[in-house]
């Protein structure tokens, strides 16, 4: 699954987040890299225990919970608290695959990474390079937009040669573990929503909605 989700943040929310991030205490991103990733990672991150990380992370989670497209596509059960990175002056992150399981700082909880997400804070014209490359697809979205993709995908961030690229990134444990099943549910949900707009009184809506929930019941893992 790979899906672009527009307008997770509106213009006012984006401006507030950008202002806070530009004054952030950025640290060497290699401090959070694993044994293999440390050799291919060259960026900056906010510390996970930085109050700004926690404040903006909570804000993003609240926005996502109110975004119907994200909820329908990800079917989130648990979300790793959002983190924040900055790429500038040649900053890059070579080919890697995300960890399968993440610990939640300060808790005994672990979260399986089914989906990876990047929320962009910089407009594409503000920097050169910096594309997120997932498999063979190059992604550079407008600020406030989010890309959602399978955590098992090989991906990288191309070197930033001008300007700076600010983003948030996090991982989702979905109610539905398998990408193929999640894609079927999203396609079915899209069809239900379209039918509701076209023929809101159709009895088929009840039937299709029942099929959706029965499939979700069959495939859900909690």
Curated annotation (Swiss-Prot):
Cofactor info, note text: Binds 1 Fe(2+) ion per subunit.
Pfam family for this entry, one: 2OG-FeII_Oxy_3
Binding site for Fe cation: 96, 98, 155
GO annotation terms (biological process): DNA damage response; intracellular iron ion homeostasis
Coiled coil, from the record: none
Enzyme Commission numbers on file: 1.14.11.-
Keywords attached to this entry: Dioxygenase, Iron, Metal-binding, Oxidoreductase, Vitamin C
Domain Fe2OG dioxygenase, first and last residues per copy: 78-174
GO molecular function: 2-oxoglutarate-dependent dioxygenase activity; iron ion binding; L-ascorbic acid binding
Superkingdom assignment: Bacteria
Enzyme class: oxidoreductase
Cysteine-cysteine disulfides: none
Cofactor entry: Fe(2+); L-ascorbate
Residues annotated for 2-oxoglutarate binding in this entry: 165
PANTHER family with a match to the protein in the record: PKHD-TYPE HYDROXYLASE YBIX (PTHR41536:SF1)
Name this polypeptide is given: PKHD-type hydroxylase Pmen_0803
Species annotation: Ectopseudomonas mendocina (strain ymp) (Pseudomonas mendocina)
Lineage: Bacteria, Pseudomonadati, Pseudomonadota, Gammaproteobacteria, Pseudomonadales
